[in-house]
Amino acid sequence: MTSPRTILSGHDIAPKKSLGQNFLCDPQAAEMIVRKCGLSKADVVVEVGPGTGALTIPAAGQAAWVYAIETDGRLIEPLKETVRAAGLDNVTVLHRDIMKTDIREICREAGRKLVVLGNLPYYISSQILMDLVEKREAVDRAVLMFQQELARRIAAPPGNREYGRISVALRYCAELSTVARLKPNLFFPRPGVDSEVVRIVFRPWPGNRDCDEALFFAMIKSAFATRRKTIKNALSAGMTKISPSAWEELLVRADVAPTVRAETLDVGDFLNICRHYKAMSGNISTKEA
C-alpha cells in the first residue's frame, strides 16, 4: 500500500491534531486487523474514519461492500483515488460525521446487520461506542482501534479505577476481547501511547427483556457523572423524581449499600436498581427521569 505520509504530502495535507489523526502505515497490521473482523463476501462494513484507506482496501477485498465514512473533507479525494487505484468497485466513500450518521439506515439498505471497523480518535471514541451500543440492532460486531487508555476503560472490571459508564454499557450488551496491541511506530504521526484493537460482538437482547434500556443508560450516566460521590448521592443528584431518602430505601431494597461508589457495582446491580426504581417511581417517562 502507498504510505499515508506519501499520500498526504502528495495532496499537501497535514494531519490535524484536533481530529486525533494518526494514520496506520503498516500493511501487515492492517491485514491482521481486517482478519479479526472475520469477513465474508456477504458482509457489509461501515468503516469509521478511513483516512487514506489502510483498512478500507483489505476490507473491500473480503466484504460485499464497504461504506467508508470520513469527516475530514480533505481526505475524500485521496481516499477515492486509493480505491480506484486498487481496482475496487464495492466502496462508497461518504463525507460525513459518524455521530450525525444513523447506521440503522445503512443496515436497512444493506438488508443485514453491519460490521463496524475503524481507528477511532481518542476525543470521540466514547461517544461513538455509546452510539453503537444504543443502535446495536444494526450491528453484528465491531473491530476498533483505541488508544490504550480508553481500551483499558472499556475492558475494566468492577472495582477497577478505570471502570465507568462505557464499561457497564458494553458488559450489558456485548462480548469483548482485546485482539492486538500496536506500537506507536506503526502510525503517522506517531501517537504518544500504544493502541489496542478490541473486537466487540453485540448481543441485541442481553437476556433482560423487561429492562427499560433508556432508563438503564440514563441511570449509569448519572451514577458515574460524579465518581467521588456515593451511589445514593450520585443518583439522587442526577435523577430527581424521587427524594434522597427514597433513593436510600430503594438501594437497600435492591441489596446495594447506599454508601458505596458506582465503580464497585456490576451490571446486575444496576439492572436491579433500575427495576426497583421503576417499581417505586411508577409510570414516569425516562426523559423526565
From Swiss-Prot:
GO-annotated cellular components: cytosol
UniProt subcellular location: Cytoplasm
Catalytic activity: adenosine(1518)/adenosine(1519) in 16S rRNA + 4 S-adenosyl-L-methionine = N(6)-dimethyladenosine(1518)/N(6)-dimethyladenosine(1519) in 16S rRNA + 4 S-adenosyl-L-homocysteine + 4 H(+)
Chief place where the protein resides: cytoplasm
Enzyme class: transferase
InterPro entries: KsgA/Erm, rRNA_Ade_diMease-like_C, rRNA_Ade_Mease_Trfase_CS, rRNA_Ade_methylase_Trfase_N, rRNA_adenine_dimethylase, SAM-dependent_MTases_sf
GO MF annotation: an example: 16S rRNA (adenine(1518)-N(6)/adenine(1519)-N(6))-dimethyltransferase activity
Keyword annotations: Cytoplasm, Methyltransferase, RNA-binding, rRNA processing, S-adenosyl-L-methionine, Transferase
EC number: 2.1.1.182
UniProt-annotated binding residues for S-adenosyl-L-methionine: 22, 24, 49, 70, 97, 119
NCBIfam families, A to Z: ksgA
Role according to the record: Specifically dimethylates two adjacent adenosines (A1518 and A1519) in the loop of a conserved hairpin near the 3'-end of 16S rRNA in the 30S particle. May play a critical role in biogenesis of 30S subunits.
Assigned protein family: Belongs to the class I-like SAM-binding methyltransferase superfamily. rRNA adenine N(6)-methyltransferase family. RsmA subfamily.
HAMAP family, alphabetized: 16SrRNA_methyltr_A (MF_00607)
Protein name: Ribosomal RNA small subunit methyltransferase A
Native species: Desulfosudis oleivorans (strain DSM 6200 / JCM 39069 / Hxd3)
Organism classification: Bacteria, Pseudomonadati, Thermodesulfobacteriota, Desulfobacteria, Desulfobacterales
